[in-house]
Regions:
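Short, small/polar-rich loop/turn modules that mediate ligand/substrate recognition or access, typified
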Residues: 138-143, 209-211
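Substrate-binding pocket helix/loop in short-chain dehydrogenase/reductase
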Residues: 61-63, 69-74, 100, 179
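Catalytic loop of short-chain dehydrogenase/reductase
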Residues: 99-138, 150-152
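A short, exposed helix-loop element centered on a Lys and neighboring polar residues
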Residues: 85-86, 130
Length: 225
């Protein structure tokens, strides 16, 4: 929650002070709410780089999800990123530079049965970005891409695997080991690797990439395209 964010911000401030000298501001807010977004934009509005990464909806069986559960997932994982894009993209275009990266999921390309809420909501965002990224924004130096993580060693992975273990009746260790063996790299990714890919997409070096869905999954997706 807010305490974790504050700890991360403290470390980031220390790192920047010792290297680039850049200043760091942080806001603890629920970005999926109107009030949370207002709190962020009260600090500043002229963002050149925006990375959206709302927490994924819970795994489960679609038969147990009520309409409100679906709406909450769509609001957080589709509509919130769209609102953030809407609030920043025209300013980016006016300044001639902008980078937007949406953290979605490899389930967009290879849906996972217990992640139906994520599959649906994030696929909607993917379709929206496919159109917007190829509009006049591309000629204004603004790129919009999606970064699709596979199985990374995070709390989110553990939550998903816990759901799979409960559904199958297997132990957590057995489910984790079986999942690991499906990945050609034979391991889970680490957050530092993921951050480096995201940093590249936000850099000037990625100026000719837009509207792409970039998979980082250790080779797990077996499709040609």
């Amino acid at each position: 929650g807010a305490e974790v964010l504050q700890q991360a911000a403290t470390h980031l401030i220390a790192d920047c002070a010792g290297s680039s000298g850049a200043s760091v501001l942080f806001v603890a807010a629920d970005i999926t709410t109107v009030e949370g977004r207002a709190a962020v934009f009260s600090v500043r509005k002229d963002f050149d780089i925006v990375v959206t990464n709302a927490g994924g909806p819970p795994p489960g069986d679609f038969r147990s999800w009520e309409r409100d559960t679906w709406i909450k997932a769509i609001d957080a994982n589709m509509l919130t990123p769209i609102e953030l894009i809407k609030a920043t993209v025209d300013g980016m275009a006016a300044r001639g530079f902008g980078r937007i990266v949406n953290i979605t999921s490899s389930a967009v390309k290879a849906p996972i049965d217990i992640l139906g809420l994520s599959n649906g909501a994030r696929s909607g965002l993917t379709g929206f970005v496919a159109g917007l990224s190829r509009s006049k924004l591309a000629a204004s130096g603004v790129t919009i891409n999606n970064l699709l993580p596979g199985a990374f060693d995070t709390d989110r992975l553990k939550t998903t695997m816990k759901g799979a273990a409960e559904k199958s009746g297997q132990s957590m260790d057995a489910v984790m080991d079986a999942r690991r063996k499906t990945i050609p790299a034979q391991r889970f990714g680490n957050p530092q690797e993921f951050g480096a890919i995201c940093a590249f997409l936000c850099s000037t070096h990625a100026g000719y990439m837009t509207g792409q869905n970039v998979l980082a999954d250790g080779g797990a997706y077996s499709g040609t395209f």
